[in-house]
Protein backbone atom coordinates (compact mmCIF):
# COMPACT_ATOMS: atom_id res chain seq x y z
CA UNK A 1 0.00 0.00 0.00
CA UNK A 2 2.79 2.45 0.93
CA UNK A 3 4.66 1.68 -2.29
CA UNK A 4 1.53 2.38 -4.35
CA UNK A 5 1.04 5.76 -2.62
CA UNK A 6 4.66 6.76 -3.27
CA UNK A 7 4.34 5.73 -6.92
CA UNK A 8 1.08 7.72 -7.26
CA UNK A 9 2.68 10.86 -5.77
CA UNK A 10 5.65 10.52 -8.13
CA UNK A 11 3.34 10.26 -11.18
CA UNK A 12 1.38 13.36 -10.05
CA UNK A 13 4.58 15.38 -9.56
CA UNK A 14 5.84 14.27 -12.94
CA UNK A 15 2.63 15.47 -14.59
CA UNK A 16 2.59 18.78 -12.74
CA UNK A 17 6.31 19.53 -13.16
CA UNK A 18 7.44 18.07 -16.46
CA UNK A 19 11.05 18.29 -17.60
CA UNK A 20 11.38 21.28 -20.00
CA UNK A 21 13.55 24.16 -21.12
CA UNK A 22 11.94 26.71 -18.82
CA UNK A 23 12.45 30.44 -19.20
CA UNK A 24 14.05 32.00 -16.11
CA UNK A 25 13.99 35.80 -15.76
CA UNK A 26 16.85 37.45 -13.92
CA UNK A 27 15.31 40.71 -12.66
CA UNK A 28 17.37 43.65 -11.45
CA UNK A 29 15.78 46.98 -10.59
CA UNK A 30 16.58 49.56 -13.25
CA UNK A 31 17.95 47.01 -15.75
CA UNK A 32 16.48 45.65 -18.95
CA UNK A 33 14.94 42.16 -18.53
CA UNK A 34 16.79 39.54 -20.56
CA UNK A 35 15.32 35.96 -20.57
CA UNK A 36 17.83 33.10 -20.38
CA UNK A 37 17.17 29.50 -21.41
CA UNK A 38 18.22 26.87 -18.88
CA UNK A 39 17.50 23.16 -18.46
CA UNK A 40 15.79 22.77 -15.11
CA UNK A 41 14.84 19.87 -12.93
CA UNK A 42 11.58 18.06 -13.33
CA UNK A 43 10.59 19.52 -9.97
CA UNK A 44 10.32 23.01 -11.59
CA UNK A 45 7.21 24.08 -13.43
CA UNK A 46 7.22 26.33 -16.46
CA UNK A 47 5.08 29.42 -15.73
CA UNK A 48 4.25 31.91 -18.46
CA UNK A 49 3.91 35.45 -17.05
CA UNK A 50 1.84 38.11 -18.78
CA UNK A 51 3.26 40.92 -16.63
CA UNK A 52 6.15 41.29 -14.20
CA UNK A 53 5.95 44.06 -11.57
CA UNK A 54 9.12 44.80 -9.64
CA UNK A 55 8.72 46.85 -6.47
CA UNK A 56 11.87 48.48 -5.13
CA UNK A 57 13.53 51.76 -4.25
CA UNK A 58 14.67 53.82 -7.23
CA UNK A 59 18.03 55.52 -7.14
CA UNK A 60 18.24 59.21 -7.94
CA UNK A 61 21.86 58.99 -9.16
CA UNK A 62 23.70 56.29 -11.06
CA UNK A 63 27.12 56.40 -12.73
CA UNK A 64 28.31 54.48 -15.76
CA UNK A 65 31.87 55.14 -16.87
CA UNK A 66 32.19 58.97 -17.04
CA UNK A 67 28.46 59.73 -17.24
CA UNK A 68 26.18 60.59 -14.31
CA UNK A 69 22.50 59.66 -14.75
CA UNK A 70 19.72 61.43 -12.84
CA UNK A 71 16.36 59.66 -12.56
CA UNK A 72 13.78 62.45 -12.71
CA UNK A 73 11.00 60.11 -11.50
CA UNK A 74 12.48 60.54 -8.02
CA UNK A 75 11.80 64.29 -8.12
CA UNK A 76 8.51 66.06 -7.63
CA UNK A 77 7.67 69.45 -9.14
CA UNK A 78 4.46 71.35 -9.77
CA UNK A 79 2.43 70.63 -12.87
CA UNK A 80 3.50 72.77 -15.81
CA UNK A 81 6.95 73.48 -14.33
CA UNK A 82 9.99 74.06 -16.51
CA UNK A 83 13.47 72.56 -16.27
CA UNK A 84 14.64 75.35 -13.95
CA UNK A 85 12.17 74.20 -11.28
CA UNK A 86 13.37 70.61 -11.67
CA UNK A 87 17.11 71.21 -11.30
CA UNK A 88 16.61 73.27 -8.15
CA UNK A 89 15.41 70.03 -6.48
CA UNK A 90 18.49 68.01 -7.48
CA UNK A 91 21.02 67.60 -4.64
CA UNK A 92 24.41 69.01 -5.64
CA UNK A 93 22.98 71.10 -8.49
CA UNK A 94 23.51 74.85 -8.09
CA UNK A 95 21.98 77.49 -10.35
CA UNK A 96 23.07 81.14 -10.22
CA UNK A 97 20.65 82.87 -12.55
CA UNK A 98 22.13 86.34 -12.06
CA UNK A 99 25.56 85.19 -13.29
CA UNK A 100 24.14 82.66 -15.78
CA UNK A 101 26.03 79.78 -14.14
CA UNK A 102 24.95 76.16 -13.61
CA UNK A 103 27.12 73.66 -11.74
CA UNK A 104 26.90 70.13 -10.34
CA UNK A 105 28.95 69.26 -7.26
CA UNK A 106 31.13 72.29 -7.89
CA UNK A 107 31.78 71.50 -11.56
CA UNK A 108 30.52 74.19 -13.99
CA UNK A 109 28.21 73.12 -16.82
CA UNK A 110 28.65 74.88 -20.16
CA UNK A 111 25.32 74.17 -21.80
CA UNK A 112 22.16 72.10 -22.17
CA UNK A 113 21.58 69.41 -24.83
CA UNK A 114 18.43 67.67 -26.05
CA UNK A 115 19.00 64.01 -27.01
CA UNK A 116 22.69 64.72 -27.64
CA UNK A 117 22.26 67.94 -29.66
CA UNK A 118 22.84 71.53 -28.49
CA UNK A 119 19.72 73.32 -27.27
CA UNK A 120 19.25 77.12 -27.40
CA UNK A 121 22.85 77.72 -28.48
CA UNK A 122 24.24 76.79 -25.04
CA UNK A 123 22.30 79.68 -23.48
CA UNK A 124 21.67 78.11 -20.07
CA UNK A 125 18.94 80.51 -18.95
CA UNK A 126 16.97 80.16 -22.19
CA UNK A 127 17.31 76.36 -22.13
CA UNK A 128 16.12 76.01 -18.53
CA UNK A 129 13.16 78.33 -19.07
CA UNK A 130 12.02 76.84 -22.39
CA UNK A 131 12.19 73.13 -21.55
CA UNK A 132 9.01 71.68 -19.95
CA UNK A 133 9.60 69.19 -17.15
CA UNK A 134 6.83 66.88 -18.37
CA UNK A 135 8.92 66.01 -21.44
CA UNK A 136 12.01 64.97 -19.44
CA UNK A 137 12.66 61.25 -18.94
CA UNK A 138 16.33 61.23 -17.90
CA UNK A 139 19.16 63.69 -17.25
CA UNK A 140 22.78 62.94 -18.10
CA UNK A 141 25.95 64.80 -17.12
CA UNK A 142 29.20 64.25 -19.01
CA UNK A 143 32.18 65.93 -20.64
CA UNK A 144 31.06 66.44 -24.23
CA UNK A 145 33.65 66.22 -26.99
CA UNK A 146 33.27 68.45 -30.02
CA UNK A 147 32.95 66.99 -33.50
CA UNK A 148 36.55 68.04 -34.18
CA UNK A 149 37.83 66.30 -31.03
CA UNK A 150 35.98 63.11 -31.99
CA UNK A 151 37.48 63.25 -35.48
CA UNK A 152 41.08 63.75 -34.34
CA UNK A 153 40.78 61.72 -31.13
CA UNK A 154 42.57 64.47 -29.15
CA UNK A 155 40.88 66.39 -26.34
CA UNK A 156 41.76 70.10 -26.32
CA UNK A 157 42.04 69.98 -22.52
CA UNK A 158 39.14 72.35 -21.83
CA UNK A 159 36.22 71.22 -19.69
CA UNK A 160 32.94 71.07 -21.59
CA UNK A 161 30.54 69.45 -19.14
CA UNK A 162 26.94 69.59 -20.32
CA UNK A 163 23.49 68.64 -19.09
CA UNK A 164 21.94 66.28 -21.65
CA UNK A 165 18.18 65.70 -21.58
CA UNK A 166 16.58 62.50 -22.83
CA UNK A 167 12.97 63.21 -23.75
CA UNK A 168 10.10 60.81 -23.14
CA UNK A 169 9.14 58.56 -26.02
CA UNK A 170 5.56 59.85 -25.85
CA UNK A 171 6.83 63.35 -26.65
CA UNK A 172 9.15 62.36 -29.48
CA UNK A 173 7.64 63.24 -32.84
CA UNK A 174 4.73 65.07 -31.22
CA UNK A 175 4.07 68.79 -31.25
CA UNK A 176 3.32 70.01 -27.73
CA UNK A 177 2.44 73.46 -26.48
CA UNK A 178 1.46 75.37 -23.38
CA UNK A 179 -0.46 78.58 -22.78
CA UNK A 180 0.04 80.30 -19.43
CA UNK A 181 -1.71 83.38 -18.02
CA UNK A 182 -0.93 84.22 -14.39
CA UNK A 183 -2.17 87.48 -12.86
CA UNK A 184 -2.00 88.46 -9.21
CA UNK A 185 -2.17 91.41 -6.85
CA UNK A 186 -0.05 94.55 -7.28
CA UNK A 187 -0.27 94.09 -11.04
CA UNK A 188 1.98 91.02 -11.01
CA UNK A 189 1.62 88.96 -14.18
CA UNK A 190 3.17 86.26 -16.34
CA UNK A 191 1.90 85.41 -19.83
CA UNK A 192 3.60 82.75 -21.94
CA UNK A 193 3.07 80.77 -25.12
CA UNK A 194 5.39 77.82 -25.78
CA UNK A 195 5.66 75.14 -28.45
CA UNK A 196 8.09 72.21 -28.70
CA UNK A 197 8.79 69.39 -31.12
CA UNK A 198 11.37 66.76 -30.08
CA UNK A 199 12.76 63.69 -31.83
CA UNK A 200 14.84 60.86 -30.39
CA UNK A 201 17.68 61.45 -32.88
CA UNK A 202 18.29 64.96 -31.50
CA UNK A 203 16.20 66.98 -33.94
CA UNK A 204 14.13 69.57 -32.13
CA UNK A 205 12.20 72.78 -32.67
CA UNK A 206 11.26 75.15 -29.87
CA UNK A 207 9.56 78.56 -29.79
CA UNK A 208 8.70 80.63 -26.72
CA UNK A 209 7.05 84.02 -26.29
CA UNK A 210 6.87 85.38 -22.75
CA UNK A 211 5.93 88.68 -21.10
CA UNK A 212 6.09 89.16 -17.34
CA UNK A 213 7.14 91.45 -14.50
CA UNK A 214 8.18 88.69 -12.07
CA UNK A 215 11.89 88.82 -12.91
CA UNK A 216 12.54 91.49 -10.27
CA UNK A 217 11.07 92.41 -6.90
CA UNK A 218 10.36 96.02 -7.81
CA UNK A 219 6.68 96.82 -8.16
CA UNK A 220 5.71 99.23 -10.88
CA UNK A 221 3.51 99.48 -13.92
CA UNK A 222 6.46 100.18 -16.22
CA UNK A 223 8.56 97.19 -15.15
CA UNK A 224 8.44 94.26 -17.54
CA UNK A 225 10.45 91.69 -19.46
CA UNK A 226 9.52 90.50 -22.96
CA UNK A 227 11.30 87.49 -24.46
CA UNK A 228 11.07 85.79 -27.83
CA UNK A 229 13.35 82.77 -28.23
CA UNK A 230 13.57 79.89 -30.66
CA UNK A 231 15.78 76.92 -31.44
CA UNK A 232 15.95 74.42 -34.30
CA UNK A 233 18.11 71.35 -34.92
CA UNK A 234 17.67 69.78 -38.35
CA UNK A 235 19.50 66.82 -39.87
CA UNK A 236 19.75 66.45 -43.63
CA UNK A 237 20.47 62.77 -44.02
CA UNK A 238 23.45 61.39 -42.13
CA UNK A 239 25.96 63.98 -43.31
CA UNK A 240 24.62 67.45 -42.47
CA UNK A 241 23.40 68.78 -39.12
CA UNK A 242 22.14 72.35 -38.75
CA UNK A 243 21.72 73.98 -35.33
CA UNK A 244 20.36 77.53 -35.00
CA UNK A 245 18.90 79.66 -32.21
CA UNK A 246 17.51 83.17 -31.83
CA UNK A 247 16.75 85.29 -28.76
CA UNK A 248 15.14 88.74 -28.48
CA UNK A 249 14.92 90.35 -25.04
CA UNK A 250 13.51 93.65 -23.76
CA UNK A 251 13.84 94.52 -20.06
CA UNK A 252 12.58 97.64 -18.24
CA UNK A 253 13.07 98.09 -14.52
CA UNK A 254 12.58 101.06 -12.18
CA UNK A 255 13.29 101.13 -8.46
CA UNK A 256 13.38 103.44 -5.44
CA UNK A 257 15.67 102.79 -2.45
CA UNK A 258 16.02 104.62 0.89
CA UNK A 259 19.07 104.04 3.12
CA UNK A 260 19.98 105.21 6.59
CA UNK A 261 23.13 104.39 8.55
CA UNK A 262 25.11 105.60 11.55
CA UNK A 263 28.88 105.82 12.00
CA UNK A 264 30.27 105.75 15.54
CA UNK A 265 33.62 107.57 15.38
CA UNK A 266 35.98 108.91 18.04
CA UNK A 267 35.16 112.45 16.88
CA UNK A 268 31.45 111.87 17.27
CA UNK A 269 28.53 110.07 15.70
CA UNK A 270 27.73 110.69 12.05
CA UNK A 271 24.37 110.00 10.44
CA UNK A 272 23.85 109.41 6.75
CA UNK A 273 20.59 109.37 4.79
CA UNK A 274 20.25 108.75 1.07
CA UNK A 275 17.61 108.14 -1.58
CA UNK A 276 18.28 106.45 -4.91
CA UNK A 277 15.95 106.44 -7.92
CA UNK A 278 16.93 104.29 -10.89
CA UNK A 279 15.46 103.36 -14.25
CA UNK A 280 16.98 100.80 -16.61
CA UNK A 281 15.95 99.96 -20.17
CA UNK A 282 17.83 97.14 -21.89
CA UNK A 283 17.29 95.50 -25.25
CA UNK A 284 19.41 92.61 -26.52
CA UNK A 285 19.22 90.40 -29.62
CA UNK A 286 21.35 87.28 -30.13
CA UNK A 287 21.66 84.65 -32.87
CA UNK A 288 23.72 81.49 -33.20
CA UNK A 289 24.16 79.04 -36.08
CA UNK A 290 26.30 75.90 -36.45
CA UNK A 291 26.73 73.62 -39.45
CA UNK A 292 28.40 70.20 -39.31
CA UNK A 293 29.08 68.50 -42.64
CA UNK A 294 30.53 64.99 -42.79
CA UNK A 295 31.75 65.12 -46.38
CA UNK A 296 32.86 61.50 -46.20
CA UNK A 297 34.21 59.09 -43.60
CA UNK A 298 37.59 60.85 -43.60
CA UNK A 299 36.60 64.49 -44.05
CA UNK A 300 34.76 66.81 -41.63
CA UNK A 301 33.76 70.47 -42.03
CA UNK A 302 32.46 72.63 -39.16
CA UNK A 303 31.19 76.20 -39.56
CA UNK A 304 29.80 78.32 -36.73
CA UNK A 305 28.75 81.94 -36.35
CA UNK A 306 27.20 83.90 -33.53
CA UNK A 307 26.58 87.50 -32.67
CA UNK A 308 24.49 89.83 -30.59
CA UNK A 309 23.40 93.42 -30.56
CA UNK A 310 22.18 95.36 -27.57
CA UNK A 311 21.39 98.82 -26.34
CA UNK A 312 20.78 100.17 -22.86
CA UNK A 313 19.64 103.37 -21.19
CA UNK A 314 20.30 103.66 -17.45
CA UNK A 315 19.33 106.67 -15.34
CA UNK A 316 20.14 107.11 -11.63
CA UNK A 317 19.30 109.99 -9.31
CA UNK A 318 20.99 109.91 -5.90
CA UNK A 319 20.49 112.39 -3.03
CA UNK A 320 22.65 112.16 0.10
CA UNK A 321 22.73 114.01 3.45
CA UNK A 322 25.44 113.67 6.11
CA UNK A 323 24.56 114.88 9.63
CA UNK A 324 26.70 115.43 12.70
CA UNK A 325 23.60 114.87 14.78
CA UNK A 326 20.32 113.46 13.65
CA UNK A 327 18.83 116.86 12.85
CA UNK A 328 18.73 118.68 9.54
CA UNK A 329 20.11 121.86 11.16
CA UNK A 330 23.52 120.25 11.67
CA UNK A 331 24.05 119.04 8.11
CA UNK A 332 27.72 118.62 7.23
CA UNK A 333 27.36 117.91 3.52
CA UNK A 334 24.53 117.38 1.09
CA UNK A 335 24.74 116.33 -2.49
CA UNK A 336 22.90 115.18 -5.56
CA UNK A 337 24.25 113.04 -8.37
CA UNK A 338 22.36 112.38 -11.57
CA UNK A 339 23.95 109.96 -13.98
CA UNK A 340 22.63 108.90 -17.40
CA UNK A 341 24.46 106.21 -19.37
CA UNK A 342 23.46 105.16 -22.87
CA UNK A 343 25.30 102.46 -24.78
CA UNK A 344 25.07 100.48 -28.00
CA UNK A 345 27.15 97.34 -28.28
CA UNK A 346 27.60 94.47 -30.69
CA UNK A 347 29.95 91.53 -31.09
CA UNK A 348 30.43 88.68 -33.52
CA UNK A 349 32.43 85.46 -33.87
CA UNK A 350 32.88 83.29 -36.97
CA UNK A 351 34.94 80.09 -37.10
CA UNK A 352 35.53 77.20 -39.48
CA UNK A 353 37.66 74.06 -39.41
CA UNK A 354 38.33 71.36 -42.00
CA UNK A 355 39.80 67.98 -40.99
CA UNK A 356 41.07 65.26 -43.30
CA UNK A 357 42.27 61.84 -42.18
CA UNK A 358 45.17 60.30 -44.04
CA UNK A 359 46.48 56.76 -44.03
CA UNK A 360 45.09 53.70 -42.31
CA UNK A 361 46.49 54.53 -38.86
CA UNK A 362 44.20 57.55 -38.42
CA UNK A 363 46.58 60.50 -38.78
CA UNK A 364 44.89 63.77 -39.73
CA UNK A 365 45.45 67.38 -40.80
CA UNK A 366 43.22 70.22 -39.56
CA UNK A 367 42.95 73.80 -40.81
CA UNK A 368 41.23 76.25 -38.45
CA UNK A 369 40.30 79.91 -38.91
CA UNK A 370 38.48 82.31 -36.57
CA UNK A 371 37.38 85.91 -36.89
CA UNK A 372 35.77 87.94 -34.11
CA UNK A 373 35.32 91.36 -32.67
CA UNK A 374 33.17 93.73 -30.69
CA UNK A 375 32.38 97.41 -30.54
CA UNK A 376 30.63 99.61 -28.03
CA UNK A 377 29.60 103.25 -27.95
CA UNK A 378 28.84 104.68 -24.52
CA UNK A 379 27.67 108.20 -23.66
CA UNK A 380 27.81 109.07 -19.98
CA UNK A 381 26.35 112.34 -18.69
CA UNK A 382 26.80 113.18 -15.01
CA UNK A 383 25.61 116.15 -12.98
CA UNK A 384 27.11 116.34 -9.50
CA UNK A 385 26.35 119.04 -6.93
CA UNK A 386 27.91 118.89 -3.44
CA UNK A 387 27.49 121.49 -0.68
CA UNK A 388 29.93 121.74 2.25
CA UNK A 389 27.78 123.52 4.85
CA UNK A 390 30.55 124.04 7.42
CA UNK A 391 33.13 125.25 4.88
CA UNK A 392 32.54 128.87 3.87
CA UNK A 393 33.42 130.37 0.53
CA UNK A 394 34.81 133.84 -0.15
CA UNK A 395 31.43 135.56 0.33
CA UNK A 396 30.50 133.63 3.47
CA UNK A 397 28.16 131.06 1.93
CA UNK A 398 28.36 127.28 1.73
CA UNK A 399 31.21 125.93 -0.40
CA UNK A 400 29.98 124.35 -3.59
CA UNK A 401 31.51 121.64 -5.79
CA UNK A 402 29.78 121.44 -9.16
CA UNK A 403 30.48 119.00 -11.97
CA UNK A 404 28.51 118.62 -15.17
CA UNK A 405 30.42 116.36 -17.55
CA UNK A 406 29.68 114.35 -20.66
CA UNK A 407 31.93 111.45 -21.63
CA UNK A 408 31.90 109.61 -24.94
CA UNK A 409 33.57 106.19 -24.62
CA UNK A 410 33.79 104.31 -27.93
CA UNK A 411 35.68 100.97 -27.97
CA UNK A 412 36.61 98.67 -30.85
CA UNK A 413 38.26 95.25 -30.90
CA UNK A 414 39.03 92.89 -33.80
CA UNK A 415 40.83 89.53 -33.67
CA UNK A 416 41.72 86.87 -36.24
CA UNK A 417 43.53 83.52 -36.05
CA UNK A 418 44.53 80.82 -38.52
CA UNK A 419 46.32 77.56 -37.72
CA UNK A 420 47.36 74.18 -39.11
CA UNK A 421 47.39 71.07 -36.90
CA UNK A 422 48.73 67.57 -37.43
CA UNK A 423 47.62 64.59 -35.34
CA UNK A 424 49.54 61.30 -35.30
CA UNK A 425 48.45 58.13 -33.44
CA UNK A 426 50.83 55.78 -31.63
CA UNK A 427 48.67 52.71 -31.23
CA UNK A 428 45.01 52.88 -30.24
CA UNK A 429 45.47 54.67 -26.92
CA UNK A 430 48.08 57.38 -27.47
CA UNK A 431 47.92 60.35 -29.87
CA UNK A 432 50.18 63.36 -30.30
CA UNK A 433 49.19 66.66 -31.91
CA UNK A 434 51.26 69.64 -33.01
CA UNK A 435 50.19 72.89 -34.60
CA UNK A 436 51.35 76.28 -35.83
CA UNK A 437 49.25 79.42 -36.12
CA UNK A 438 49.19 83.16 -36.72
CA UNK A 439 47.36 85.67 -34.54
CA UNK A 440 46.44 89.33 -35.03
CA UNK A 441 44.51 91.55 -32.63
CA UNK A 442 43.74 95.25 -32.42
CA UNK A 443 42.09 97.04 -29.49
CA UNK A 444 41.14 100.69 -29.41
CA UNK A 445 39.38 102.64 -26.66
CA UNK A 446 38.76 106.37 -26.50
CA UNK A 447 37.44 108.82 -23.93
CA UNK A 448 36.20 112.26 -25.01
CA UNK A 449 35.13 114.51 -22.12
CA UNK A 450 33.19 117.78 -22.35
CA UNK A 451 32.32 120.37 -19.69
CA UNK A 452 28.55 121.01 -19.72
CA UNK A 453 28.72 123.77 -17.09
CA UNK A 454 29.89 126.19 -19.79
CA UNK A 455 27.49 127.08 -22.63
CA UNK A 456 29.88 126.20 -25.48
CA UNK A 457 30.72 122.83 -23.79
CA UNK A 458 34.52 122.87 -24.23
CA UNK A 459 36.63 119.75 -24.68
CA UNK A 460 38.64 118.77 -21.56
CA UNK A 461 42.08 117.48 -22.53
CA UNK A 462 43.07 116.32 -19.05
CA UNK A 463 40.08 113.95 -18.84
CA UNK A 464 40.32 112.61 -22.42
CA UNK A 465 42.56 109.99 -24.01
CA UNK A 466 42.91 107.46 -26.83
CA UNK A 467 44.60 104.05 -26.44
CA UNK A 468 45.53 101.61 -29.21
CA UNK A 469 47.02 98.14 -28.81
CA UNK A 470 48.09 96.03 -31.79
CA UNK A 471 49.29 92.42 -31.38
CA UNK A 472 50.94 90.22 -34.00
CA UNK A 473 51.85 86.73 -32.84
CA UNK A 474 53.01 83.27 -33.85
CA UNK A 475 51.72 80.30 -31.89
CA UNK A 476 53.11 76.79 -31.45
CA UNK A 477 50.99 74.07 -29.81
CA UNK A 478 51.93 70.60 -28.57
CA UNK A 479 49.40 68.17 -27.12
CA UNK A 480 49.31 64.55 -25.92
CA UNK A 481 46.17 62.45 -25.36
CA UNK A 482 46.12 58.99 -23.73
CA UNK A 483 42.97 56.96 -23.12
CA UNK A 484 43.31 53.62 -21.32
CA UNK A 485 40.98 51.36 -19.36
CA UNK A 486 41.52 53.15 -16.06
CA UNK A 487 43.70 56.14 -16.96
CA UNK A 488 42.94 59.19 -19.10
CA UNK A 489 45.78 61.68 -19.48
CA UNK A 490 45.71 64.89 -21.46
CA UNK A 491 48.52 67.44 -21.47
CA UNK A 492 49.83 70.19 -23.69
CA UNK A 493 51.36 73.63 -23.95
CA UNK A 494 50.70 76.69 -26.10
CA UNK A 495 53.55 79.14 -26.68
CA UNK A 496 52.95 82.44 -28.46
CA UNK A 497 55.63 84.95 -29.45
CA UNK A 498 54.09 88.42 -29.70
CA UNK A 499 54.99 91.86 -30.98
CA UNK A 500 52.87 94.40 -29.10
CA UNK A 501 52.59 97.97 -30.34
CA UNK A 502 51.18 100.42 -27.80
CA UNK A 503 50.05 103.96 -28.57
CA UNK A 504 48.43 106.51 -26.24
CA UNK A 505 47.36 110.10 -26.78
CA UNK A 506 46.59 112.08 -23.65
CA UNK A 507 46.55 115.80 -22.84
CA UNK A 508 48.30 116.77 -26.13
CA UNK A 509 51.03 114.17 -25.51
CA UNK A 510 51.66 111.01 -27.51
CA UNK A 511 53.55 107.83 -26.61
CA UNK A 512 54.18 105.12 -29.20
CA UNK A 513 56.50 102.17 -28.66
CA UNK A 514 56.79 98.45 -29.40
CA UNK A 515 57.62 95.62 -27.03
CA UNK A 516 58.12 91.88 -27.47
CA UNK A 517 56.46 89.33 -25.22
CA UNK A 518 56.08 85.57 -24.86
CA UNK A 519 52.99 83.87 -23.49
CA UNK A 520 52.90 80.32 -22.07
CA UNK A 521 49.72 78.31 -21.47
CA UNK A 522 50.47 74.80 -20.11
CA UNK A 523 47.67 72.34 -19.33
CA UNK A 524 47.66 68.93 -17.67
CA UNK A 525 44.80 66.64 -16.75
CA UNK A 526 44.78 63.07 -15.42
CA UNK A 527 41.81 60.92 -14.42
CA UNK A 528 41.91 57.49 -12.76
CA UNK A 529 38.76 55.37 -12.46
CA UNK A 530 38.42 51.81 -11.17
CA UNK A 531 34.61 51.77 -11.20
CA UNK A 532 34.29 52.57 -7.50
CA UNK A 533 36.51 55.60 -6.99
CA UNK A 534 37.35 58.34 -9.45
CA UNK A 535 40.32 60.67 -8.92
CA UNK A 536 40.91 63.67 -11.17
CA UNK A 537 43.89 66.05 -11.17
CA UNK A 538 44.07 69.23 -13.27
CA UNK A 539 46.67 71.97 -13.72
CA UNK A 540 46.32 75.18 -15.75
CA UNK A 541 48.75 78.04 -16.18
CA UNK A 542 48.80 81.19 -18.25
CA UNK A 543 50.85 84.33 -18.76
CA UNK A 544 49.12 87.66 -18.13
CA UNK A 545 50.45 90.77 -19.83
CA UNK A 546 50.21 94.20 -18.12
CA UNK A 547 47.56 96.59 -19.39
CA UNK A 548 48.25 99.59 -21.61
CA UNK A 549 47.66 102.04 -18.77
CA UNK A 550 50.09 100.15 -16.53
CA UNK A 551 52.91 100.43 -19.09
CA UNK A 552 52.56 104.05 -20.17
CA UNK A 553 54.48 106.83 -18.42
CA UNK A 554 51.88 109.50 -19.21
CA UNK A 555 49.92 110.85 -16.25
CA UNK A 556 46.34 109.55 -16.14
CA UNK A 557 44.34 112.45 -14.69
CA UNK A 558 40.88 111.15 -15.45
CA UNK A 559 40.37 111.28 -11.67
CA UNK A 560 42.05 114.44 -10.28
CA UNK A 561 42.16 112.95 -6.78
CA UNK A 562 44.00 109.83 -8.00
CA UNK A 563 46.63 110.51 -10.67
CA UNK A 564 48.15 107.32 -12.14
CA UNK A 565 51.57 106.92 -13.76
CA UNK A 566 52.54 103.70 -15.57
CA UNK A 567 55.77 101.71 -15.42
CA UNK A 568 57.22 100.57 -18.79
CA UNK A 569 59.51 98.09 -16.96
CA UNK A 570 56.65 95.86 -15.83
CA UNK A 571 57.10 92.15 -16.60
CA UNK A 572 54.32 89.67 -17.40
CA UNK A 573 52.69 87.82 -14.52
CA UNK A 574 52.20 84.05 -14.44
CA UNK A 575 49.05 82.57 -12.90
CA UNK A 576 48.52 78.88 -12.15
CA UNK A 577 45.79 76.74 -10.68
CA UNK A 578 45.87 73.17 -9.37
CA UNK A 579 42.69 71.25 -8.57
CA UNK A 580 42.04 67.74 -7.31
CA UNK A 581 38.72 65.92 -7.18
CA UNK A 582 37.83 62.57 -5.61
CA UNK A 583 34.44 60.96 -6.19
CA UNK A 584 33.28 57.86 -4.30
CA UNK A 585 30.43 56.37 -6.32
CA UNK A 586 28.74 53.99 -3.90
CA UNK A 587 27.83 56.61 -1.30
CA UNK A 588 28.05 59.65 -3.60
CA UNK A 589 30.80 61.36 -1.60
CA UNK A 590 32.85 64.02 -3.37
CA UNK A 591 36.01 65.78 -2.15
CA UNK A 592 37.40 68.83 -3.94
CA UNK A 593 40.48 70.98 -3.45
CA UNK A 594 41.84 73.99 -5.32
CA UNK A 595 45.09 75.91 -5.12
CA UNK A 596 46.07 78.93 -7.18
CA UNK A 597 48.77 81.57 -6.99
CA UNK A 598 50.53 84.18 -9.11
CA UNK A 599 54.20 84.88 -9.77
CA UNK A 600 55.40 88.41 -10.45
CA UNK A 601 51.89 89.77 -9.94
CA UNK A 602 51.07 93.42 -10.53
CA UNK A 603 50.81 95.89 -7.65
CA UNK A 604 50.25 99.61 -7.31
CA UNK A 605 52.42 101.92 -5.23
CA UNK A 606 50.41 104.73 -3.65
CA UNK A 607 52.06 108.06 -2.81
CA UNK A 608 50.12 110.71 -0.90
CA UNK A 609 50.89 114.27 -1.93
CA UNK A 610 50.34 116.80 0.90
CA UNK A 611 47.81 119.53 0.13
CA UNK A 612 49.08 123.01 -0.70
CA UNK A 613 49.20 125.62 2.05
CA UNK A 614 46.41 127.64 0.50
CA UNK A 615 43.26 126.27 -1.06
CA UNK A 616 40.84 128.25 -3.17
CA UNK A 617 37.20 127.22 -2.79
CA UNK A 618 34.35 128.28 -5.00
Predicted regions: what they are:
Residues 155-158, 259-268, 318-328, 382-391, ...:
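Flexible, surface-exposed loop regions and adjacent strand-edge segments
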Residues 9-18:
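Bacterial N-terminal signal peptides
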Residues 22-51, 57-317, 337-379, 419-441, ...:
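Membrane-proximal, glycine/serine-rich, low-complexity loop/turn segments characteristic
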Residues 275, 415-417, 459-465, 475, ...:
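Outer membrane beta-barrel strand-and-loop segments of large Gram-negative receptors
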Residues 1-7:
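Bacterial N-terminal signal peptides that target proteins for export
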Residues 304-306, 310-338, 366-409, 437-463:
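Surface-exposed, low-complexity loop segments enriched in small/polar and acidic residues
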Residues 217-218, 272-277, 333-340, 401-408, ...:
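Extracellular loop and loop/strand-boundary signature of outer-membrane beta-barrel proteins
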Residues 405, 431-529, 538-539:
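Signature of Gram-negative outer-membrane beta-barrel scaffolds
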Amino acid sequence: MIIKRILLIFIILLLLFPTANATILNLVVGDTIYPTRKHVSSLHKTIELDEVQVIGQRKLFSIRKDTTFINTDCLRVRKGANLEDLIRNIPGMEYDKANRQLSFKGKPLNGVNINGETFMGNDIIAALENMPTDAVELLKLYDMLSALEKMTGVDDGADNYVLDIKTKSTYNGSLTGTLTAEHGNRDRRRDEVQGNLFNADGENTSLTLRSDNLSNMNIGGNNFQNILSGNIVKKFGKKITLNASLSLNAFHNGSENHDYDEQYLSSGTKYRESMLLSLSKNHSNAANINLQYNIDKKTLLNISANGNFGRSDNLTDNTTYLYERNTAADTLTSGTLRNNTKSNGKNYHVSADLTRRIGKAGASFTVKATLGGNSNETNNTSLSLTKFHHLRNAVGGDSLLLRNLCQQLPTLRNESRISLQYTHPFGKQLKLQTGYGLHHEEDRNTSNTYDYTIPNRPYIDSLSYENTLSICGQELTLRMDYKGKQWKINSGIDVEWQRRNICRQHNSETVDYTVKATEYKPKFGAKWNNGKIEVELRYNGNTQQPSIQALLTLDDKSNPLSVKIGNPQLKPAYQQQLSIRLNERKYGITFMGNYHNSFNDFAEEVTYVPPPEQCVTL
